[in-house]
Amino acid sequence: MAGHSKWANIKRQKARVDAKKGKTFTQLSRAIIVAARNGLPDPAANLQLRTAIEKAKAAGIPNDNIERAIAKGAGTYGNDENNLEEIRYEGYGPGGVAILIEALTDNRNRTAADLRAAFSKNGGNLGETGCVSWMFDQKGVVILEGKVEEEVLLDASVEGGADTYEIFDSDEEQGAEVFTEVSNLETLNQTLQEKGLPVKEAELRWIPNNSIEVTDPEQGRSLLKLMDALESLDDVQNVTANFDMADELIALTIA
């Protein structure tokens, strides 16, 4: 698939280098609240909720906090979180790289101000709605972690209705990402699990149609600093961008 998200790959590498926790407890709890609010509060029947819970557990969020977040989303634990909105913001990074941000917020003005500050401090600009979203398509992605036999993955992908897949097989990383249409994500996820493949999680992801090649180390460093700054904001759930960068340059910028 053209334009697999390079930022998703870089985040995996950065996690190995600096061992930072990814999302904050606030970000992960909000994802659970909204998933429970948008669908059934039962993770067995709600893939979005199940994925949010799995990410929260992986980050060490206590079960009591997870249950409370589910109850808030279901409307059985007070009404403080009912004002959370899902909003998409768009902008440009250094070198004209298009950046798409998904946020959950109870205060649009605060979120916009925080995003604008992050962009301006790191050589970018927060844009108007629609300025870059046309450059991306949303896909379902099933993430596998561990040794993957390509023949098994190919058969399961065909049976599960996948569009394509990408295998990672190196000393540092083994696994794969399998891509499909949004409406088929649950089916693909179940099929891969039934075939015994090491499914870690499933998610929706914005995939760029085309990518800008970043070759300048300073530009690359500024861009990754901006992406980190955006990801670190409590209101931000996901960030993606339409750039590509050689692995050698990535190693220099995240070392």
From Swiss-Prot:
Q: Main localisation, per the record?
A: cytoplasm
User: What GO terms describe the biological role, i.e. biological process, of this protein?
Assistant: regulation of DNA-templated transcription
Known HAMAP family for this protein?
Transcrip_reg_TACO1
Q: Which Gene3D superfamilies match?
A: 1.10.10.200, 3.30.70.980
Q: Which domain of life is it from?
A: Bacteria
The name under which this protein is listed is Probable transcriptional regulatory protein PCC7424_2775
Alphabetically ordered keywords of this record? Cytoplasm, DNA-binding, Transcription, Transcription regulation
Residues spanning the signal sequence:
none
Q: Which GO terms describe its molecular function?
A: DNA binding
List the PANTHER family: TRANSCRIPTIONAL REGULATORY PROTEIN YEBC-RELATED, TRANSLATIONAL ACTIVATOR OF CYTOCHROME C OXIDASE 1
- Stated family: Belongs to the TACO1 family.
Q: Coiled-coil regions in this chain?
A: none
Alphabetized Pfam families for the sequence: TACO1_YebC_N, Transcrip_reg
